[in-house]
């Protein structure tokens, strides 16, 4: 089973924030694959489907960003999901709004949700799809920026990136991730 995890924060006040683009991609995949995301005992929204003959699972941790690993590790253990079958989707300050970048592994890059995953999974060896949100301008604190909403100017590029990231996830169901990287990295 492939597990697609979108990082974000639960609650109405965070729904459309930059930090929640991982949730946006999971919502898009749920729509495409007709998956109903339900609250699971793993402190997250979770649903499964069969896509191109492959079993897939979607997850939106409800632990808040900095504790994402507390949801994902028990889920992987319960369903016996290998680290090779996990793809994590999240926001990246170091990419401009609308850019996506796929990686096979890596450090947290300062992202607290990814730090939590690395801590709870015990490895950096999981696949990632990073969606650019850009950096704050004019000395705005990073926390305020990531918890802020996209500007009207940023929205079209971000909407396109969410669709591209979902397309990459769809391809990753069947294709080797290295091929998906070659097709989607800009």
UniProtKB/Swiss-Prot annotation:
Active site positions, chain numbering: 19 (proton acceptor)
Localization, UniProt: Cytoplasm
TM regions (residue ranges): none
Main location: cytoplasm
Any one of the GO CC terms: cytoplasm
Enzyme class at the top of the EC tree: hydrolase
Catalyses which reaction(s): an N-acyl-L-alpha-aminoacyl-tRNA + H2O = an N-acyl-L-amino acid + a tRNA + H(+)
Keyword Methyltransferase: no
GO molecular function per UniProt: peptidyl-tRNA hydrolase activity; tRNA binding
Superkingdom, taxonomy of origin: Bacteria
Residues carrying the site annotation Stabilizes the basic form of H active site to accept a proton: 91
Keywords associated with the record: Cytoplasm, Hydrolase, RNA-binding, tRNA-binding
GO biological process: protein quality control for misfolded or incompletely synthesized proteins; rescue of stalled ribosome
EC number, UniProt record: 3.1.1.29
Record has Membrane as a keyword: no
Residues annotated as site: Discriminates between blocked and unblocked aminoacyl-tRNA: 9
Pfam families with a match to the protein in the record: Pept_tRNA_hydro (PF01195)
PANTHER family: PEPTIDYL-TRNA HYDROLASE
Family under the similarity heading: Belongs to the PTH family.
Subunit structure: Monomer.
Protein name, per record: Peptidyl-tRNA hydrolase
Organism of this sequence: Geobacillus kaustophilus (strain HTA426)
């Amino acid at each position: 089973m492939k597990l697609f995890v979108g990082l974000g924060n639960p609650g109405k006040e965070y729904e459309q924030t930059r930090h929640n683009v991982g949730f946006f991609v999971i919502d898009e995949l749920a729509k495409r694959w007709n998956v109903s995301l339900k609250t699971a005992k793993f402190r997250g929204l979770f649903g499964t489907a069969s896509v191109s003959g492959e079993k897939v699972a979607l997850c939106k941790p409800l632990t808040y960003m900095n504790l994402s690993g507390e949801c994902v590790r028990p889920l992987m253990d319960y369903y016996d999901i290998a680290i090779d079958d996990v793809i994590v989707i999240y926001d990246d300050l170091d990419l401009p709004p609308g850019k996506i970048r796929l990686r096979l592994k890596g450090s947290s890059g300062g992202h607290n949700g990814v730090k939590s995953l690395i801590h709870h999974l015990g490895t950096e060896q999981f696949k990632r799809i990073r969606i650019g949100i850009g950096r704050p301008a004019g000395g705005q604190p990073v926390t305020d920026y990531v918890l802020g909403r996209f500007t009207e100017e940023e929205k079209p590029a971000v909407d396109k990136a969410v669709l591209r990231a979902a397309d990459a996830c769809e391809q990753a169901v069947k294709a080797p991730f290295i091929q998906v990287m070659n097709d989607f990295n800009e």
